From Swiss-Prot:
The UniProt record lists the keyword rRNA-binding: no
AB hydrolase-1 domain residues: 84-378
Gene: Lipa
Record field: catalytic activity: a sterol ester + H2O = a sterol + a fatty acid + H(+); cholesteryl (9Z-octadecenoate) + H2O = cholesterol + (9Z)-octadecenoate + H(+); a triacylglycerol + H2O = a 1,2-diacylglycerol + a fatty acid + H(+); 1,2-di-(9Z-octadecenoyl)-glycerol + (9Z)-octadecenoate + H(+) = 1,2,3-tri-(9Z-octadecenoyl)-glycerol + H2O
Signal peptide feature range: 1-25
Catalytic activity, EC: 3.1.1.13
Protein name from the UniProt record: Lysosomal acid lipase/cholesteryl ester hydrolase
Residues carrying a glycan: 34, 99, 159, 271, 319
Length: 397
């Protein structure tokens, strides 16, 4: 371990000294911006949403595009709910250049775009009574995101815009939250015109990568390793490494591979000039309990509520000795789904099972070359995915 540390220090020293190993490219200005600053850079506002259990979520809005900025009339509303567990925040919808980011593309197409954040990530770390230093603050998983965060966000957006319905777009865990919420709360589903599921993760039976390996460890060991509070929060060290190391020509690929190790490899489809922007905004953090919940999905081979570890604790939370199962077969909402053939998390075999369980599936497309991150950062995402999303929204308008 000491030898590894010395090697890392040696490499970093060479890079910072501007030695013979290569050159340092200019830092992208957006690498030093948070999501609010990125959006405000384009002239758009931020909102705060309070959930029923007291969490305060940051929601970002792009009310108009570049071509329709003087159009003040009502527009169809889109809610982008990225929430991939412990890696991302709303910035991921806008961290590519404007003509390659779904948030900006939808705004330019005439939609009122809202982008949400989960409790516990960089932009949703406030609570009415709790502090992030308290264990109680971090006692949540995607159960609470589906039960509280998504309904609060949708209701706030509809109230603010005066609309009766909106389009909901989710990626990864954002889809998990949507499927749970819309199947458990039919009244909430009625407020959504159509659900767009990008690389949905509802089971990990055929998945591969680090998450599957973590899933083999006992819950108590995971808590011993990571504590009981936050997991992979955004940090000053990560930002420093992103802006000082990931801008170096020979290090960009290494920084990009950090993401690929989790989600699958497709290096040719990533904008390498934006790696420092990606890495300064990811990871954005979540709770250890949320991470443990996902490892339970791996262990038990089914999507169910969080297992509190004993019959007594489960009975206290659920009035039964075991966690209740989630069934999406009850969801009555037009749904379009896209999947990737090289996605390590939303594996094709898991997706094929999911497709048989969606009662109102109206569209599905598999993109054979794509991994989990191509849906948000892929260079070819506009013409292979985003244009189809816009077309379907206008069709179901």
């Amino acid at each position: 371990m000491q030898l590894l540390g010395r090697v890392i220090c040696f490499v970093v020293g060479i890079l910072l000294s501007g030695g013979p190993t290569g050159t340092i490219s200019a830092v992208d200005p957006e690498a030093n911006m948070n999501v609010t600053e990125i959006i405000m850079h384009w002239g758009y506002p931020e909102h705060s949403v309070q959930t029923g259990d007291g969490y305060i979520l940051g929601v970002h809005r792009i009310p108009h595009g570049r071509k329709n900025q003087f159009d003040k009339g009502p527009k169809p509303v889109v809610y982008l709910q990225w929430r991939h567990g412990f890696l991302a925040d709303s910035s991921n919808w806008v961290t590519n250049i404007d003509n390659n980011s779904l948030g900006f593309i939808l705004a330019d197409a005439g939609f009122d775009v809202w982008m949400g954040n989960s409790r516990g990530n960089t932009w949703s770390r406030k609570h009415k009574t709790l502090s992030v230093s308290q264990d109680e603050y971090w006692a949540f998983s995607f159960d609470e995101m589906a039960k509280y965060d998504l309904p609060a966000s949708i209701n706030y957006i509809l109230n603010k815009t005066g609309q009766e319905q909106l389009y909901n777009v989710g990626h990864s865990q954002g889809c998990t939250i949507g499927f749970i919420a819309f199947s458990q709360m039919p009244e909430l589903a009625k407020k959504v015109k159509m659900f767009f599921a990008l690389a949905p993760v509802l089971s990990l039976n055929f998945a591969s990568g680090p998450m599957v390996k973590l899933g083999r460890l006992p819950d108590l060991l995971l808590e011993d390793l990571f504590g009981q509070k936050q997991f992979l929060p955004q940090s000053a060290m990560v930002k420093w490494l992103s802006t000082h190391i990931c801008t170096h020509v020979i290090m960009k690929e290494l920084c990009a591979n950090i993401f690929f190790l989790i989600c699958g490899f497709n290096e040719k489809n990533l904008n390498m000039s934006r790696v420092d922007v990606y890495t300064t905004h990811c990871p954005a953090g979540t709770s250890v309990q949320n991470m443990v919940h996902w490892t339970q999905v791996v262990k038990y081979h089914k999507l169910q509520a969080f297992d509190w570890g004993s019959s007594d604790k489960n009975y206290f939370h659920y009035n039964q000795s075991y966690p209740p199962l989630y069934s999406i077969k009850d969801m009555q909402l037009p749904t379009a789904l896209w999947s990737g053939g090289k996605d390590w998390l939303a594996d094709t075999s898991d997706i094929n099972i999911l497709l048989t369980e969606i009662p109102t599936l109206v569209y599905h497309k598999n993109i054979p070359e794509w991994d989990h991150l191509d849906f948000i950062w892929g260079l070819d995402a506009p013409w292979r995915l985003y244009n189809e999303v816009v077309s379907l929204m206008k069709k179901y308008q």
